[in-house]
Amino acid sequence: MLDPSQAEVDQDILKSSVVQGALEKVKAYQSTVQKMKAGLDADPQLNIKPAIVKELDFASLRDTLKTLNTAFEEDTQRGTDRLIRVILQDITELETANAQKDGVPRSPRRLEIMQGKLAKLDKAFGDYLAFAN
């Protein structure tokens, strides 16, 4: 299921402190992505790897998304699982696109790729959060 308006959500699980904590973390992840995009817009040569590694820690992010996912019924989870895979893949690709040699400026094409990944991540987080609303 990919339509949040049709999502089946267990409200008791969603209201639990563990899932509410995960929900807040997912919102913070989306905010981090938005800040990275703004930083890259302001400075096309900005190295965002420290933020990716620290703020979007792969294992922690995956666990947080899966914790929030427990509030959704099985059919809904099929759609949200797909979004989780997209988010994790895009973070991996963003980290790869960010890599560059010292002293070599980032090319316009690489900048475009990174901005595209950040925009896609922002949308994916928004789409995922829509299931919890």
Where are these regions (language model features)?
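Alpha-helical segments in soluble extracytoplasmic regions
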Residues: 14-72, 90
